[in-house]
Design a protein with these regions (language model features):
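Aromatic- and acid-rich polysaccharide-binding/catalytic face
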Residues: 101-131, 181-185
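Solvent-exposed loop/turn segments at secondary-structure junctions
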Residues: 43-47, 96-101, 118-123, 161-165, ...
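P-loop/Walker A phosphate-binding loop and immediately adjacent motor/lid segment at beta-alpha junctions
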Residues: 126-162, 191
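Substrate-binding cleft of extracellular glycoside hydrolase catalytic domains
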Residues: 1-82, 86
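Aromatic-lined carbohydrate-recognition surfaces of secreted/lumenal glycan-active proteins
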Residues: 40-43, 73-100, 153-164
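Alpha-helical scaffolding within the catalytic cores
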Residues: 25, 94-106, 137-145, 162-171
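Loop/turn elements at helix/coil->beta-strand transitions in domains of secreted/extracellular proteins
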Residues: 32-38, 82-90, 109-112, 151-156, ...
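Substrate-binding cleft of secreted/luminal carbohydrate-active enzymes
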Residues: 153-191
Length: 191
């Protein structure tokens, strides 16, 4: 039960504390070497929300809803920054369903970058597979929604994606994505 991970005295809380300690040890090595890192923890928390028999999402950190998720995020943030003194971290909140991102957003004080995962190549073969035809749209409605979510205070990234929007479409649609991270080899190696 994820709700127990934010309750002191529970085995889930103790386990999460150990996980954060292990993570902090590794991040400390990077801080000692003056290496900044974009950390995208607890990503896609609302992924597939409500589509399982118990109404939960596909990752454990989202399985008890937005309020518990935000508590978990803030616990992670506070522990790493205040208890362990890690200040080389750029915190990235990664939405899955942008339509309800505001419900899950941990808040401007705990986030540096907002991000979205885009998988929307054209699936137009009879077998349901991608034809390889990339969707070059800049998906500006999603970009604009995430930009407005933070009142323009945060940069907006495409943290996972298949095809990359065309430069022309990003200019036309005024969608200034901070970066892209193609997730599959097909999209890394194709034009």
């Amino acid at each position: 039960n994820t709700a127990n991970a934010v309750k002191e005295g529970t085995k889930e809380y103790e386990y999460f504390q150990e996980c954060m300690k292990d993570l902090a040890e590794q991040l400390q090595k990077l801080q000692d070497a003056n290496v900044p890192i974009i950390l995208r923890p607890l990503h896609e928390a609302q992924g597939n929300e409500g589509n399982y028999s118990d109404g939960t999402s596909w990752f454990w950190w989202g399985d008890r809803g937005a309020e518990v998720y935000k508590e978990l995020w803030k616990l992670l943030y506070t522990t790493l920054t205040e208890e362990y003194g890690l200040h080389n971290i750029i915190w990235e909140y990664n939405s899955y369903n942008y339509a309800n991102s505001d419900t899950w957003y941990p808040g401007d004080d705990y986030v540096d970058i907002v991000a979205y995962d885009k998988y929307n190549c054209d699936f137009n073969r009879d077998d349901g597979q991608s034809s390889g035809t990339p969707n070059l749209s800049a998906i500006s409605p999603i970009f604009n929604y995430l930009y407005e979510l933070t009142s323009g205070k945060k940069m907006v990234a495409m943290a996972e994606n298949d095809s990359i929007p065309s430069e022309e479409n990003m200019v036309i649609e005024n969608a200034g994505w901070l970066y892209f991270c193609p997730w599959y080899g097909d999209h890394l190696m194709s034009s």
